[in-house]
A protein has these predicted regions:
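Positively charged, Gly/Ser-enriched RNA/tRNA-binding surfaces
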Residues: 1-2, 47-227
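Class II aminoacyl-tRNA synthetase-like tRNA-binding/catalytic domains
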Residues: 1-6, 18
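A structural signal for short, well-ordered beta-strand segments and their strand-loop junctions
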Residues: 6-9, 110
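Short capping loops/turns at secondary-structure boundaries
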Residues: 8, 22-25, 37, 82, ...
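Short acidic alpha-helix initiation/capping motifs at coil-to-helix transition points
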Residues: 8-10, 38-41, 52-55
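Short, conserved phosphate-binding/catalytic loop or strand-edge motifs used
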Residues: 9-17
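Short acidic, glycine/serine/threonine-rich loops at helix termini
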Residues: 17-22, 122-123
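Acidic, His- and aromatic-enriched active-site or binding-groove loops in soluble protein domains
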Residues: 24-46, 105
């Protein structure tokens, strides 16, 4: 499979905390999201100036242009975090990085605090995956805890979409062939054995075995998980 890729992770709550502190109206917010999504930070600053946003908010939004990179940018983000909500968003990203470090995935991870969830339904973690040989992300996703409510049921959720055309283009240009028909292994673990489960899964994957891990529910027997 793909060996050269980057997963860019953000937290919509950080961006949203900046919005809340700026006290801008809905129309300005929509335009601001669009500008920052297009990485037009100069235009974003002009918009905030016209909207008479707080100077501290303008400074925080301007800093977003530099909030892209390795785990070290999370420390920089703390310097401009305007609220406890923003700090919690950063702490959440740090926790995710700690788990990914157990997987030894650090080299594939970057952070982008300017991710705003332009569609408006993301509520926390948001991510995109990139590789060379494509013009766009090959995977996009995140949390959308309130989206299902619009269809009649309150249910937290997380999901992602694989952009098949971009993925196939990347595989072709990188001359990668994918075998099919392989069976997958499932590793069940108790909550306190997460690190052991990850290490075992890495051993299996190192032998080209498709492997998934899943925390065992305390009220379920092993038979419940047998296909």
């Amino acid at each position: 499979g793909l060996e050269e890729f980057q997963i860019s992770i953000g937290n919509v709550d950080f961006f949203q905390s900046l919005i809340e502190e700026s006290e801008i109206d809905d129309e300005t917010e929509e335009r601001l999201r669009e500008l920052i999504n297009n990485r037009n930070f100069f235009g974003a600053d002009e918009l905030l100036e016209e909207a008479d946003a707080k100077p501290v908010s303008r400074k925080a939004f301007s800093a977003l242009s530099e909030m892209v990179g390795g785990v070290e940018i999370l420390e920089e983000a703390k310097k401009v975090a305007p609220s406890k909500k923003a700090m919690k968003a950063i702490w959440r990203l740090e926790k995710i990085y700690a788990i990914l470090s157990v997987y030894k995935m650090e080299q594939y991870i970057t952070f982008d605090l300017s991710m705003s969830g332009i569609y408006g339904y993301y509520t926390g973690i948001i991510f995109r995956g990139y590789t060379f040989g494509t013009g766009d992300a090959i995977v996009k996703g995140g949390r959308y805890d309130h989206l299902v409510e619009k269809f009649g049921k309150a249910e937290p959720a997380i999901g992602f979409a694989i952009v098949v055309d971009e993925l196939m283009s990347a595989l072709s240009r990188q001359k990668i062939q994918i075998s099919s028909g392989e069976k997958s292994s499932l590793i069940l673990y108790d909550k306190e054995r997460l690190k052991d489960a990850i290490q075992l899964a890495m051993e299996f994957r190192g032998k080209d075995k498709n492997t998934q891990i899943l925390q065992k529910a305390s009220d379920k027997s092993l038979e419940f998980y047998v296909d």
